[in-house]
Each structure stands twice: as C-alpha cells, then as structure tokens.
C-alpha cells in the first residue's frame, strides 16, 4: 500500500500475515509516509460494515486474495462500500473469474493485464481493473 500513499489522502491496509503488517509500518516510517494504517487479520474477520464506517468509505480497493479467492462475505461488504474502482490481483484466474461474476452487476471490467512473474511455469498473476457501473 505504501507505493500508493503519495496519491491518496489515506491508505488502510489489511493483511493476513502479521509480519507483513510490521514490515509495512516500518517501511511507512522509513519513507516518511504518515497517511497509512495497517491491520493484521483475515479479511472475512476484519472487513465488515463497522470497519468501513470507522475507516471511511474507500474510493479504490486493491484486492490480492489467496488462491481460493475472495470470500462471499467480503465481496458483500465491498459491494456495500461501493468504491469507484477495484484493482483485483489474482494468482488464480479461475477464482478471479468466479469473484468477478459476483461483482458484475455493480462493476464492469475496464482493463485486464496478465503478468508472467514465474517464467517457464503455468503460473500467472492477473490484474483486473473494475469500475463502478
């Protein structure tokens, strides 16, 4: 999230791995970034309507879920929060397609960019930009 901080009024990050949150906080401090807040935990336990109310409705959400994709309760909260844009990064195009179908009524795909981060393997990262309808 730190790479976006200069273009945003506020960054709120949620990550399952507590050590990654510790690193993000250190990187924010080292780079003089003061508009970030980070929370450790599983998205389906952390992200709810109260979390959105406490942290503000997002303009943009960047999703990078595990291989299993985004849990339905998380998608429901995202749809209620209604950000203008969603950037969905996925290592599993099948679960990404499933999740995109669940958001299709509220969002349209504006851009898709596969990224070959693991040459000579079948693995690909897929980045999709969604905009609210």
Listing of model-derived features with the role each one plays in the protein:
Residues 1-133:
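Rossmann-like S-adenosyl-L-methionine
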